């Protein structure tokens, strides 16, 4: 069913840290490419008089070329699929943590509707709607932090997809390295076939 899986697109170094530490790492959004998005989070931080606002983004959408090319580009890109309910059970109740789907709004709508401060971390412009983003934020009024780790069970990972641009010759060695991490020997890991799929090609060959 839709919404049962949360996809986290990132890079191999971040994945090695995630699996080794068994944590999700929320970071400062100031480095994000979408400056409108990071500005809303800055405004939320200022209006709530917070010392820290950090975030981590997922997608509820199926695998797409757009997600790979924007969020996990290159041969070191990866996509971790999480079982939504199991991940939520792990983070629910964590101090300072909020999470929800992102709302996408037209500029014309925003001009006629005054935004609420509490919604700023989860509001983006309509052109980003294809991301189908689900977001976790961490906030603190007393502690200034540059990152925040949240523990999660490895059992909440459904599968890991390696980059479709990862050379075939490197695929098995990367899998072996990941499965050597404590607790990761049974993880389902495969290289994405998004840009080169044998079944799709065969259908072309069998066309009449």
Task: Enumerate the language-model features and the residues they cover.
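Partner-binding and oligomerization surfaces adjacent to conserved cores of proteins
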Residues: 1-208
């Amino acid at each position: 069913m839709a919404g049962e899986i949360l996809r986290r697109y990132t890079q191999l170094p971040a994945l090695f840290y995630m699996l080794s530490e068994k944590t999700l790492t929320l970071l400062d959004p100031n480095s994000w490419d979408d400056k409108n998005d990071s500005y809303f989070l800055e405004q939320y931080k200022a209006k709530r008089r917070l010392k820290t606002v950090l975030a981590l983004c997922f997608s509820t959408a199926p695998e797409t070329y757009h997600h790979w090319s924007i969020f996990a580009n290159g041969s070191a890109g990866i996509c971790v699929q999480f079982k939504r309910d199991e991940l939520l059970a792990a983070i629910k109740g964590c101090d300072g943590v909020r999470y929800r789907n992102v709302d996408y709004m037209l500029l014309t709508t925003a001009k006629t509707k005054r935004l609420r401060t509490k919604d700023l971390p989860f509001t983006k412009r309509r052109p980003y709607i294809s991301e189908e983003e689900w977001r976790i934020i961490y906030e603190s009024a007393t502690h200034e932090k540059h990152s925040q780790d949240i523990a999660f069970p490895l059992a909440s990972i459904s599968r890991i997809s390696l980059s479709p641009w990862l050379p075939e010759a490197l695929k098995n060695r990367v899998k072996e390295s990941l499965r050597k991490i404590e607790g990761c020997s049974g993880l389902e890991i495969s290289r994405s076939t998004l840009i080169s799929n044998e079944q799709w090609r065969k259908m072309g060959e069998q066309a009449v």
